[in-house]
Amino acid sequence: MIRKAFVMQVNPDAHEEYQRRHNPIWPELEAVLKSHGAHNYAIYLDKARNLLFATVEIESEERWNAVASTDVCQRWWKYMTDVMPANPDNSPVSSELQG
């Protein structure tokens, strides 16, 4: 397994909405993550700094990267654009952390 860690941001006024939308995530998104080899995916909110710290274990970078091209991921990203900064393709602005 490959362990990944990354940070994202959440809008200061959107903490509760962000948490509501993730509790739970869409079942079809969860299924896509699992079918693409993602395990133990967890996201933690740092309210004081409006940061999200995420960890995930993946089976391969190729399968993990393929999640982004799925319809459900594209819809999820669009759904989240009003609560967190997004790139032009609606993916969340994120920075990968090095271990």
UniProtKB/Swiss-Prot annotation:
Binding-site positions, substrate: Y18, Y41, W76, W77
Active site: H22 (proton donor)
Keyword set includes Acyltransferase: no
GO BP: rhamnose catabolic process
Enzyme Commission number, as recorded: 5.1.3.32
SUPFAM superfamilies named among the record's database cross-references: Dimeric alpha+beta barrel
Subunit structure: Homodimer.
Family per record: Belongs to the rhamnose mutarotase family.
Official protein name in the record: L-rhamnose mutarotase
Organism whose genome encodes this protein: Shigella boydii serotype 18 (strain CDC 3083-94 / BS512)
